[in-house]
């Protein structure tokens, strides 16, 4: 379980990114967070593995405080958290296989991984992960030779090879076309269902949130304004999340284009 206890984040310029967040996400959930740009979605997501440090409060993972963790303990906790970014975050000039093997770095010494010395078991796991997202044939291609959708699937394979217990996906389909968007979200959903990996995804599209989530969390101005099951996420609730009905309608139109 991931638990946020009275979590707040204030940026150096005084902007409040999160305001007293109290939230529990159970193991194996597929949670989609929605809200306008600047609502706090990315800040909340990235605070889980401390890419963004919180100002107040505490974040617990399986009963252990990642907020207080340091050194080896922090590295161990981060090893269980896979991160997927809108920008793919791959080493473009490296092969797909090497990018996936990057998910194994946390399990070995710096010297071994720097020299590319991974055991046979890691290679097998990397190949299995690529096969899982239907991109095995690209194992020896350079990452920058792949389409955006293919690169995002490499990111998912990397999280699988990492054997992550939690996957955080920050706007993973924002730059993708509708068909590729479906493929990427289908992959994330199937992995969540097959392996019980807790998955938290930030999305702008209301339509996609309804299609894939088991639970939707709506943020507005750094606060949670909705937290419920998909069937509870009515148009009226989305209007509250996005501020007004006009904004909500505009986003619905974008979602179905």
Swiss-Prot record:
The gene is phnC. The complex is composed of two ATP-binding proteins (PhnC), two transmembrane proteins (PhnE) and a solute-binding protein (PhnD). NCBIfam families: ABC_phnC. This is Phosphonates import ATP-binding protein PhnC. Its EC number is 7.3.2.2. It is a peripheral membrane protein. It catalyses: phosphonate(out) + ATP + H2O = phosphonate(in) + ADP + phosphate + H(+). Residues 2-246 form the ABC transporter domain. Gene3D superfamilies: P-loop containing nucleotide triphosphate hydrolases (3.40.50.300). ATP binds at residues 35-42. SUPFAM superfamilies: P-loop containing nucleoside triphosphate hydrolases. Belongs to the ABC transporter superfamily. Phosphonates importer (TC 3.A.1.9.1) family. It is found in: Cell membrane.
């Amino acid at each position: 379980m991931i638990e946020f206890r009275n979590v707040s984040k204030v940026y150096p310029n005084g902007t409040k990114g999160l305001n007293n967040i109290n939230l529990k996400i159970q193991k194996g959930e597929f949670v989609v967070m929605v809200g306008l740009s600047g609502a706090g979605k990315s800040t909340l997501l990235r605070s889980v593995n401390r890419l963004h440090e919180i100002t107040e409060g505490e974040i617990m993972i399986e009963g252990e405080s990642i907020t207080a963790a340091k050194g080896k303990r922090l590295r161990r906790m981060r090893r269980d958290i896979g991160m997927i970014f809108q920008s793919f975050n791959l080493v473009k000039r490296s092969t797909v296989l090497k990018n996936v093997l990057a998910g194994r770095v946390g399990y070995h010494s710096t010297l071994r991984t720097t020299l590319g010395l991974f055991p046979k078991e890691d290679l097998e796991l990397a190949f299995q992960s690529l096969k899982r997202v239907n991109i095995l044939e690209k194992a020896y291609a350079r990452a920058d030779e792949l389409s955006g959708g293919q690169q995002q699937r490499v990111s998912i394979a990397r999280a699988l090879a990492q054997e992550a217990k939690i996957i955080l996906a920050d706007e993973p389909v924002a730059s993708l076309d509708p068909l590729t968007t479906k493929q990427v979200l289908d992959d994330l959903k199937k992995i969540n269902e097959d392996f019980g990996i807790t998955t938290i995804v930030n999305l702008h599209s209301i339509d996609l949130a309804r299609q894939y989530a088991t639970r939707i969390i709506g943020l507005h101005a750094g606060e949670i304004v909705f937290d419920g099951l998909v069937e509870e996420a009515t148009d009226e609730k989305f209007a509250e999340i996005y501020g007004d009905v006009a904004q909500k309608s505009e986003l619905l139109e974008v979602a179905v284009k």
